Amino acid sequence: LKQFDELGPSGEFLMEFSIYDAIQSGFNHLVLITRKENKDFLFNYLRERINSSIKIDVVIQETTNLPIGMTANPKREKPWGTAHAVWCAKDFISDDFAIINADDYYGYNAFKNAANFFNSSTDENNYGLVSYKLKDTLSDFGSVSRGVCKVSNDKLSSINEHLKIERTDGIIKDFDSGNILDEDDYVSMNFWLCRSNFFNYLDSYIEKTMNELENIEKDEIYLPFAAQQLLEDNIISIEVVDSNSGWFGVTYAEDKKESVKKLREFSQSIYPIPLWKG
């Protein structure tokens, strides 16, 4: 798994830098959603590194774990997708919470701004999305898939998925549609800021969507689609929070070398070496 690639100067996983930044920003509870075979390793690995004041839970995403009244399909082996993964954490979270990918680097400012969002707003139907400029999320080694945000008065109106974005000759283009995209457009990198009531919404969304899947053995239930449905139904509003940060990830094998280089540079100025000193 690329989530367990040792990219940091002392062999750290990429997710460890996000965890470190989140803790520095005031987050005090870590919930990881993973496969059964990774549970013990992840918990033990992080528990021995992270201060005991930080609560750690590791949750297994199981295909048989479904909303009450739903029956698991015995033929289903593939995980149900990101919306279901988050729903699986429902018994471990009772407060507002942030969601991130384990294999992305988001930057300290992104977590600081996420914490500020929660500290400044308690409206249970005002959610957030920490967003990045499109130009800062491209790969030098091939096309990327991005959800481009339509924003009005700092609120998210919609997210449009573009599956083949690439910069050529200084122009950013969606090669599926042929459309030229603005490099300063905000995009979603799945850094969501949610309220505890999100699990209630996910209950009904998962049930409805699962009943509409064309291929019950392979199709997935995606977190951005769940958020967008709530937005379209006027159940929630989603504030677009500027990350004020750079992003990077490992989309292609060639990205790995660049990620190692960036983490080494950051560790000379931002992070301690090793990351979890003492």
Where are these regions (language model features)?
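N-terminal glycine-rich phosphate-binding loop and ensuing alpha1 helix
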Residues: 1-47, 54-56, 61, 95
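Phosphate- and divalent-cation-binding pockets in alpha/beta enzyme and binding domains
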Residues: 41-42, 109, 201, 226, ...
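Short phosphate-binding loop-to-helix
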Residues: 50-96
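Short, surface-exposed amphipathic charged segments that create phosphate/polyanion-binding patches used
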Residues: 68-79, 142-147, 254-258
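Short beta-strand-to-loop acidic/aromatic patch adjacent to the donor-nucleotide binding site
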Residues: 94-105
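Conserved core of the sugar-phosphate nucleotidyltransferase
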Residues: 108-192, 196
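A C-terminal functional module that forms or caps the active site or interfaces directly
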Residues: 203-235
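Hydrophobic helical membrane-anchoring modules
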Residues: 234-237, 244-278
